[in-house]
Amino acid sequence: MLNYKKYKRFETIKLKDRTWPDNEITKAPIWCSVDLRDGNQALINPMTVEEKIEFFNLLVKLGFKEIEIGFPSASQIEYDFLRRLVDENLIPDDVMVQVLTQARPHLIKRTFESLKNVKKAIVHIYNSTSVLQRDVVFNMSKEEIKEIAVEGTKLVKEYAKDFEGEILLEYSPESFTEIGRAHV
């Protein structure tokens, strides 16, 4: 971010036989803004592409180096927004954009179509893992739900092979907190 050295660090207390508490963070973490992602399609008055560009430029000015910009396979506005960023060369070389998509083949394909000519991107896939959704919505076993994640990951890796830019993969289990320890 802008100036992570602005604040003085606290002095650590050295205690014998202690290991990890003595570790220190000596550089700023990587912050990823998710302010532009997912949900635009659900708003009564969604942001326009122009508003999203203005917001993106502000995040860049603030110093964000990773910006999750949307769910281009779920919303035409978010798809168009990403394409404008790329076509108008608005993504700085030191900024990596991130896109979100469910771990479903047709959505992953559409996501990679939206990323054409992006230099660096994180493809963030997810699938639901909660017992309720697994049983009621998907009518699938725990193993079948795991397979969705595995197949989605394989598909992202396959598309990434032919992608001209740099692709990083991020996976998240949706509704993970609803699983419970017995179901992990």
Question: Language-model segments: what does each one mean?
Answer:
Residues 65-91, 95, 99-100, 127-137, ...:
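Glycine-rich, proline-tolerant flexible connector loops at the mouths of alpha/beta enzymes
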Residues 112, 130-158, 169-178:
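Hydrophobic alpha-helical hairpins/lids featuring a short glycine-rich hinge
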Residues 26-29, 63-65, 91-97, 119-121, ...:
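Short, well-ordered coil/turn segments that N-cap beta-strands
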Residues 20-45, 124-138, 166-170:
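N-terminal small/glycine-rich loop or linker at the start of catalytic domains
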Residues 83-92, 110-121, 154-164:
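Acidic (Asp/Glu)-rich catalytic clusters
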Residues 51-72:
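Catalytic domains of carbohydrate-active enzymes, especially glycoside hydrolases
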Residues 105-131, 143:
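Hydrophobic or amphipathic alpha-helical targeting/insertion segments
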Residues 182-184:
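Conserved small/polar residues in nucleotide/adenosyl-binding loops
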